[in-house]
Design a protein with these regions (language model features):
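A short, surface-exposed interaction/processing loop segment used at functional sites
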Residues: 63-83
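Short, non-transmembrane alpha-helical segments in secretory-pathway proteins
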Residues: 1-26
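Amphipathic, interaction-prone secondary-structure segments
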Residues: 26-67
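Amphipathic alpha-helical interaction segments
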Residues: 21, 38-39, 81
Length: 83
């Protein structure tokens, strides 16, 4: 499942970036497997700022339908909020 998530993210990053983003350049940030389904958040540090390609992929597998969906996002902001 983790290998498939990285493989699918790599394919989608490569398609959107117009160049090869290797599977080994992708890493799983989060993973969950409820029942026959699973979801992984995958990222890469190979996307340069300014490239028109997201750097986070959400891979969702629907085990009942035997389908896997790939959504790609771009991190827009990251800031610390003090308690």
């Amino acid at each position: 499942m983790l290998k498939k998530a990285k493989q699918l993210a790599s394919q989608e990053f490569s398609r959107l970036a117009g160049r090869e983003i290797k599977e080994e350049d992708c890493f799983v940030v989060w993973f969950s497997k409820p029942l026959p389904n699973w979801k992984a958040l995958v990222s890469t540090n190979q996307i340069k700022s300014g490239e028109k390609c997201g750097d986070y992929a959400e891979i969702t597998h629907n085990g009942d339908k035997k389908e896997t969906y790939v959504d790609v996002y771009t991190k827009v902001s990251n800031r610390a909020i003090k308690d």
